[in-house]
Amino acid sequence: MSNFFENYLRQVDDIETVSFVGRVQKIKGLLVESLGPQCAIGDLCLIDQRNGKKVCAEVLGFNGPYVSLMAYEGFSGIEVGNKVYSLNKGLEINLSDELLGRVIDSLGRPIDNKGSFLNNSYKELIFEKINPINRSIFEDQILTGVKVLDGFLPVAKGQRVGIFSGSGVGKSTLLGMIAKNSNADVNVIAFIGERGRELNEFIEHELGEERLKKSVLVVSTSDESPISRYKGAYVATMIAEYFREQGKDVALLFDSITRFANAKREMSLSLGEPPVAKGYPPSVFVEIPILLERSGFNGNGGSVTGFYTVLVEGDDFTEPVADNIKAVLDGHIILDRDLFDRGIYPSINVLSSTSRSIHRIMSLEKQKLIMKARNLLSIYKDYEDLIRTGIYLKGSNKDVDFAISKYPKIINFISQGINETFDFENLEDEIKEILS
């Protein structure tokens, strides 16, 4: 009989018998300041609106007895004196296989008109740091389905790779190719701070219905509040970790880490943190490695391979965010505007890009092929101006002549249509034939 009542007793114990209520004192910039309620940083609160509804906000900090809150969905209808209710817990999201094939927002709510989740496996958005000793070394290659990556810039399972470029050079399209063609068990795709119209385009034209069934999309568009964009990044990462715990190889496709950094900047500046590098406060550069370190191995057989797009402002690859991210990642894919303008897609600059896993996942023979291809591209680049202007005379240098003869074939190898596929088993032989 005692066992019969245990479940009910637990439910009674979980009931909050005390309600913590505060009052809105002022709205300053992006923040709501309230006197009370009793709460902790990261807790969710509900704020009364004039129309009788409530808006969800998160506790970001304290100023004496005042609580600094940022709303997820704007401040419309909030007045001084409105009640603020603490939920005494942080954001919780549904973690179950029901997520596959779904599109959710930064609060974990479905937005794809396919109904609510039936499973109630909700978990608070709290991360446990992975012991570095438990992280496996790179051993196996993940196939991206992008010929230039699989052939010249291989990516290992558990690796974290940045896709760097200025605006309009094809970062999102490259992510779409990887999402559609990779051999990952699950895709977790994060659209953070991007244009809303891109979502349906991505699903219909780049991902496809079949691949959507193996994917989870987390969306927080550019018109949403900074806290929404910020949390969306962690929601996507936590979902990737959930599938990794099941032993699956997960591709985390994140567009873009720059928008995440901008959201964190807006939040930090609102709290009064001083800017130190091109308008970015110190906490932005603390937050980036915290997020990126979530990818990789967990020691239980699963992996999260991270592909993070980085929008380089003004094509300046030394700007603070891009430079900081480079130091954390295990590889850099550089998209070249000059290649893009010449109609070479994907416009990946092989010479400027690097993968730090090549020596662990590729045989010595394959490494030699890659180095030979890079050497030919380097020679051609050194003499490119002389070749284009007709100053270089054929026969002046055997190495240059050989590079000139192979350059069109290498460029043809690099070029790949959005819906074009290839046989990975024949890739090495194809490279050998090009370079012979």
Swiss-Prot record:
GO terms for cellular component: bacterial-type flagellum; cytoplasm; type III protein secretion system complex. It comes from the Bacteria. It is an enzyme of class 7 (translocase). SMART domains: AAA. Its EC number is 7.1.2.2. Keywords: ATP synthesis, ATP-binding, Bacterial flagellum biogenesis, Bacterial flagellum protein export, Cytoplasm, Hydrogen ion transport, Ion transport, Nucleotide-binding, Protein transport, Translocase, Transport. InterPro entries: AAA+_ATPase, ATPase_alpha/beta_chains, ATPase_F1/V1/A1_a/bsu_N, ATPase_F1/V1/A1_a/bsu_nucl-bd, ATPase_T3SS_FliI/YscN, FliI_clade3, P-loop_NTPase, T3SS_ATPase_C. GO terms for biological process: bacterial-type flagellum organization; protein secretion by the type III secretion system. GO terms for molecular function: ATP binding; ATP hydrolysis activity; proton-transporting ATP synthase activity, rotational mechanism. Pfam families: ATP-synt_ab, ATP-synt_ab_N, T3SS_ATPase_C. It is found in: Cytoplasm. ATP binds at residues 165-172. The keyword Cytoplasm applies. Disulfide bonds: none annotated. It catalyses: ATP + H2O + 4 H(+)(in) = ADP + phosphate + 5 H(+)(out). NCBIfam families: FliI_clade3, fliI_yscN. Belongs to the ATPase alpha/beta chains family. This is Flagellum-specific ATP synthase. It comes from Borreliella burgdorferi (strain ATCC 35210 / DSM 4680 / CIP 102532 / B31). The gene is fliI.
